[in-house]
Amino acid sequence: MHPIVIVGTGLAGFNTVKEFRKLDKETPIVMLTADDGRNYSKPMLSAGFSKGKTADDLCMATPEKVAEQLNVDVRTGVHVAGIDATNKRVLLPDDHLDYSKLVLALGADTWTPPLEGDAVGEVFSVNDLMDYGKFRAAVEGKKTVTILGGGLIGCEFANDLSNGGFKVSLVEPMGRCLPLLLPEQASEAVGRGLADLGVQFHFGPLAKAVHHGDNGQLVTELSDGSQLESDVVLSAIGLRPRISLAKEAGLDTNRGILTDKSLRTSAEHIYALGDCAEVQGHVLPYVLPLMASARALAKTLAGETTEVSYGVMPVTIKTPACPVVVCPAAEGSEGAWEVEAEGNTVQALFRSKDGSLLGYALTGEAVKEKMKLNKELPAIMP
C-alpha cells in the first residue's frame, strides 16, 4: 500500500496530519520538506523580538518528535522535482515516491521587489523558521532596520522590532499602513500607534536600490531620491502562492492551485490547502481558513469526502501599539464604509446599499466589538 504523501511541513501540512491521525492511526504518511522540518507557529515569527525568542525557542517540536508523536515519516531537506499525476508518483532528484493520495501544502513565497544595488543579496525576508533564525542572527548587536512594505507582515515586524529595541524605518508606496486591508482612518490609527513607538514612515516612494554604505551600513535608495541608512533591510512586500510545481504537473492554477470545496485539484488523488490553494476562487493566507481546511481534508483522506466551509473569519493583526481586527468584505462587494473614530479607536463598518454588514475594520478599543459584529456577517464560503 502506497502512503499518503504530504509536501510541506508548515501549519497546513502538520495540522492535516494531526487531524487525520484522530481518524486513522495506521495509514502510512510521508511528509516531504525542503527545510529542516521543525514544527512551529508561523504567526509567531513576527512576534518573537518582543518576547526575546530565538528560532530554537519558537520550535514546538523537532521532526523526530513529530514522527514519533504522529506515526509519520518526515523527510527533511528534500527537493521535489516534479509530480507524475498519471502514475501517482512524486519525482525526486535521484528517485521517486509512489503515493495513494498527494497533499500539496506548499505555502507561499515572499515577493521581493526588483531592486538594484550591490547589497541586494543582503536583503532579508522572513517566511519560515530558518529565515527567522538567519534574520535574528543578522540583527544581533545591531540598532537600525529598514522594512520594505507596510502591509500585515511589515507592520507586525515594525511593532515587534521596535519593542525589541530597534529603530525602525518603514517604506510603503501606497501611502499608509495596511492599505489593502483597512480604510484610511483605521490605517492612520495604526500609523499613529507605531509612530509613538518611534517607527519612522516613508509613505509614497518605492525602494529602488540597496547599496553598501561607507560605514558598514546599508543604504536604501528610494524613488524620490531620498536615502535611508540602516544596519539591516527586511523585505515584507507580500506573499505569492507557490504554484509552479502544480502548474508544471498540468494541474489547473490561477492565483493559487485551483481546488473545489473538497480541496481536490484538477488531478485525481491530488489535494491542496493553505497558502498555496485557491479554493472556489478564495485565496485566504490566514490561520482560521487553514485550520478549517485541515479538518475537512483529514476526513476526505480518511474516506469521508468532506467539503470545507469558511464561516466568519476575522484576522487579528499583531500590532499591540494599536490593536487591529479586520474582516474584509468579499472581493467585488459593493458598498461603503461607515466610520466612527476617536483617537486610535476606530470602528469602520462596510455595508451594502441595503444596510447589510459585509465587513469591518476595528482598531484600538473597538476590537472589543468583534464578537458582536461577527454575528451580523455572512459566511465567507458557506
Swiss-Prot record:
Pathway: Hydrocarbon metabolism; alkane degradation. It catalyses: 2 reduced [rubredoxin] + NAD(+) + H(+) = 2 oxidized [rubredoxin] + NADH. It is an enzyme of class 1 (oxidoreductase). InterPro entries: FAD-bd_OxRdtase, FAD/NAD-bd_sf, FAD/NAD-binding_dom, Rbx-bd. One of its GO terms (biological process) is alkane catabolic process. Its cofactor is FAD. It is found in: Cytoplasm. GO terms for molecular function: flavin adenine dinucleotide binding; rubredoxin-NAD+ reductase activity; rubredoxin-NADP+ reductase activity. It comes from the Bacteria. Belongs to the FAD-dependent oxidoreductase family. Involved in the hydrocarbon hydroxylating system, which transfers electrons from NADH to rubredoxin reductase and then through rubredoxin to alkane 1 monooxygenase. This is Rubredoxin-NAD(+) reductase. It comes from Alcanivorax borkumensis (strain ATCC 700651 / DSM 11573 / NCIMB 13689 / SK2).
